Amino acid sequence: SGVSGQSGLTLDLEAKVEIGELAYFDDGKGIALQGVRLSSAADPAQLAKYHLELDILAAGDLSLTFKSENVSRFEIEEIRFVDTPGLTPITSDPSIGGIFIDYDIEGSLLSYNRGNSYIGPNNVLGGVYDLEFTITNGKLGYRTNGNEFLLDGMTLDVSSLGMIFGVTPAGELNLSMPNLLAELSVEAIRFSSNPLNHGVSNDVTTGDPLASYGSLWVNMDLNTDLRIKAGGADGLTGM
């Protein structure tokens, strides 16, 4: 990575991340994300590259802009139900498959300087943010038993202005997005039964394009409010 600064701070980041397992447990039962990886999409052995710029504006607001320097891949190889964390996975253990996303992202996050007063209709102690980003050259895939379902040629535009994130007086974690706009387009919805194929548009054995179920376009304008309350590690409530 490289760091420079004059008007704010510029960070060029190159990363290859591998996490064996992340697990969440409640009442002695857990769900584990195994084989979590971040790398270049073209070659898993290569690095994902990003350019970040951080600046404090005149009003005291914090501005972060971010941009990919290559197409990156974030992958969870297996999602399993487990009793004990950290054990070597057995192929017969219950699994719901794995997911991955390839993306080239560019966007910005603005954190407003609002002091320590309560915010919004839920009287949250936290922050107000504007988030905007665009994903291009995207692929979103689900994989299980050598079969793969793929959203190919994905573009996603997201704008969430006036987003509130913090804690309510009742101790609930609150994420409020009163102005969430999103537009998703997918060039082809593909399926592969060849276990050698992974995140590709053409079959690696035959070279033929993978079967497509057509394209997809979605436009959303949402007002959402999410509150999460902790119910304890034991008992019926959980989270």
What are the roles of these predicted feature ranges?
Residues 1-10:
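Low-complexity repetitive segments in secreted/extracellular proteins
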Residues 12-239:
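Intrinsically disordered, low-complexity polar regions and short flexible loop motifs
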